Amino acid sequence: MGGPLLPSPELITAYRNTDYQADASPTVTVTVRIDLHDPAVDGLLQSRKVGTAAFLTAFNPLSEPTGDAANARAQECLVRDLAILGIAHIAGRGVGRDETWPIEPSVLALGISRVAAEELARRYRQNAFVWVERGKAPELVLTSGLR
């Protein structure tokens, strides 16, 4: 048996070159960038009275293109799971800086623990998620051993 399968270096680069946008209000969008601390992100977390968050999606499991209907159903299930766990979220999206990547709906789960974020990412067969802590640069967290 081999070790856990990790995303290709190209996929990891694509994840790192994505702007993770959260709709803080109808007129304000906050952008999270991996490894780049932004006081606006801290302000969003502080305004929601949380110290942590995670960008999560259920779209395109294992970064394999999946049909619109299946993606929408999976995303609805993710949002339902967050509600069951009592975790508030903000609608968002991942927008690749390379315009060949499609915009991917996401959520910024507020106040979630890192363990819970990883469990949800694994449940929805995601290669990675973005971990956010107030006062720190956001981190790309790989979820190895999914396949």
Protein language model regions, located:
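N-terminal, charge-rich interaction modules
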Residues: 1-80
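A general structural signal for short secondary-structure junctions and capping/turn motifs
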Residues: 45-47, 99, 119-122
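Residues in well-ordered beta-strands of folded domains
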Residues: 57, 90, 108-110, 130, ...
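A short secondary-structure junction signal
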Residues: 67-68, 119, 140-143
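Amphipathic protein-protein interaction modules
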Residues: 72-116
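Short, compact, well-ordered microdomains
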Residues: 103-106, 110-137
